[in-house]
């Protein structure tokens, strides 16, 4: 599916696991959890910054990959270990005085449902849970989470 986003978008807000990562957690011999990132998706953060977009990451989990990405690319809004994402999204919208056609939300799981239904522009990945893919009007990337999906959204915005 070809994504369709307007020129009015100023803020890209995304979940992390399942969108920027492949939704897998790797556990090393010391019991530390790590995640794999695709460089296409990492580069997408740089492209957004260079083109004047605001960026937000709202994740249900806390992990060091988010902190590294946020610091490197000066992500304005970073919220980890969030159970009720809609409250955070509404707070961001209020703080930045955004209209509903000025932000896009990208998510893939049940903890994103309420936010995806609230967003005028909602995007998910092919491997999202069925409840997310069934949302009326949701757009689905061609690329899977952690394999260029975030970059696909960014490439749609930055032509």
Where are these regions (language model features)?
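Alpha-helical substrate-recognition element adjacent to the catalytic core
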Residues: 1-84
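Mg2+-dependent phosphoryl-transfer enzymes with acidic/Ser/Thr/Gly-rich catalytic loops
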Residues: 34-35, 86-159
């Amino acid at each position: 599916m070809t994504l369709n986003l307007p020129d009015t978008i100023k803020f890209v807000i995304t979940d992390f696991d399942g969108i920027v990562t492949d939704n897998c957690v790797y556990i090393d011999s010391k019991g530390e959890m790590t995640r794999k990132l695709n460089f296409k998706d990492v580069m997408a953060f740089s492209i957004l910054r260079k083109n004047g977009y605001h960026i937000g990451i709202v994740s249900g989990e806390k992990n060091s990959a988010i902190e590294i990405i946020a610091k490197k690319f000066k992500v304005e809004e970073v919220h980890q270990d969030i159970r009720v994402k809609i409250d955070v999204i509404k707070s961001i919208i209020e703080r930045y005085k955004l209209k509903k056609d000025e932000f896009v939300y990208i998510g893939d799981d049940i903890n994103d449902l309420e936010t995806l239904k609230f967003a005028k522009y909602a995007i998910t990945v092919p491997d999202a849970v069925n409840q997310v893919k069934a949302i009326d009007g949701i757009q689905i990337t061609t690329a899977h989470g952690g394999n260029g999906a975030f970059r696909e959204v960014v490439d749609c915005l930055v032509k």
